[in-house]
Amino acid sequence: MSETTHPTFAMVAGELSGDILGAGLIKALQHQYPDARFVGIGGPRMEALGFESIFSFEELAVMGIVEVLSRLQRLLKVRKTLIDEICSIEPACFIGIDAPDFNIGLELKLKARGIKTVHYVSPSVWAWRPKRIFKIAKATDMVLSLLPFEKAFYDKHDVPCTFVGHTLADDIPLISDKTAARNLLGLDADAEYLAVLPGSRGGELKQLAEPFVKAASLIKKRYPDIRFVTPLVNQKRREQFEEALKLHAPDLEITLVEGHSREVMAASDCILLASGTATLEAMLVKRPMVVAYRVSPITYKIAKGMMQIDQYSLPNLLSGETLVTELIQENCTESLIADAISEQLDSDFSPLKEKFMQLHKGLKCNASERAAEAVIKLIQ
């Protein structure tokens, strides 16, 4: 292994957001190491840069405690195979990108075998299950955090952490172009649009497609001229959403788009979306939003007992105040969603837009380059 000129970086990315972060990090590392090898689990953006996937990253796209338990045997088998493969490769370091319940355990095993480990995207230890910090301390040589308030938490526990900012804040312009987004998507330049984003995972659509399309039907009755547009991550999710549409709102017209979720948000006047990274994107494109989310009752009951926070969306967590409406679990109903969207459509968005702008500027730090610098410093 030649770490100085031709290093191998092992990586595991969970979900689309991890694929985006992984691709940015690979690009930044390739500037320093043009002949580096990247191997593990990654998505299409990472693979387009030469990443070698041992397993499909769909393997890790599991939501909820109950849902994870149902696939636990498969996940453990994937992790064992990865440990063997990565140890045989002897990488300069391993970088786990998000997916903490999978990656932290993997990092623990790899670090015990002498491989340097980095965890990119801090688990929400400040939000729930705070005692995970002790396992993270054992498992990682460095945590790369995306959010500014996270580093103080790690410093308090003497865990090496570097705040790098967020690649989405770097990629999305401070002022998003609604007209350009509509032209790209072939949407009406003058119509009012509500973007409906029920999530990227099958489990999310199973929980959210019904209340989202029912809410859209109610909104259509209140605002007859409004139009709807929904991005779906792939054909499988599109078919799943179309099934829900047919079942719960057969007369509702929604423009369906494969991919282009960011452009859909930029093209919209208001956004209804699932909790998660998408709430950050919605904030960064400066659009009013309503966040709604639910999981299985058992998952929620277990998770609720471990939560340290009472807000879930990133705009609210970053600001420390309630900037956006959150409708969680039993509040995730079509009537409450429709009321919240109506309030956004009828309100002056200017003060909130300015707050979103300030939050955007605080996260815009050339994250991929800063993350790469931290990794390079670790392996040199």
Swiss-Prot record:
GO molecular function, one term: lipid-A-disaccharide synthase activity
Chain's role: Condensation of UDP-2,3-diacylglucosamine and 2,3-diacylglucosamine-1-phosphate to form lipid A disaccharide, a precursor of lipid A, a phosphorylated glycolipid that anchors the lipopolysaccharide to the outer membrane of the cell.
InterPro entries from the UniProt entry: Glyco_trans_19
Pathway listed: Bacterial outer membrane biogenesis; LPS lipid A biosynthesis
Organism: Shewanella sediminis (strain HAW-EB3)
Gene Ontology cellular component annotations, sorted alphabetically: membrane
UniProt entry keywords in alphabetical sequence: Glycosyltransferase, Lipid A biosynthesis, Lipid biosynthesis, Lipid metabolism, Transferase
Lyase in keyword set: no
Disulphide bond pairs: none
Enzyme Commission no: 2.4.1.182
Protein name from the UniProt record: Lipid-A-disaccharide synthase
Catalytically driven reaction(s): a lipid X + a UDP-2-N,3-O-bis[(3R)-3-hydroxyacyl]-alpha-D-glucosamine = a lipid A disaccharide + UDP + H(+)
UniProt-listed GO biological process terms: lipid A biosynthetic process
Family: Belongs to the LpxB family.
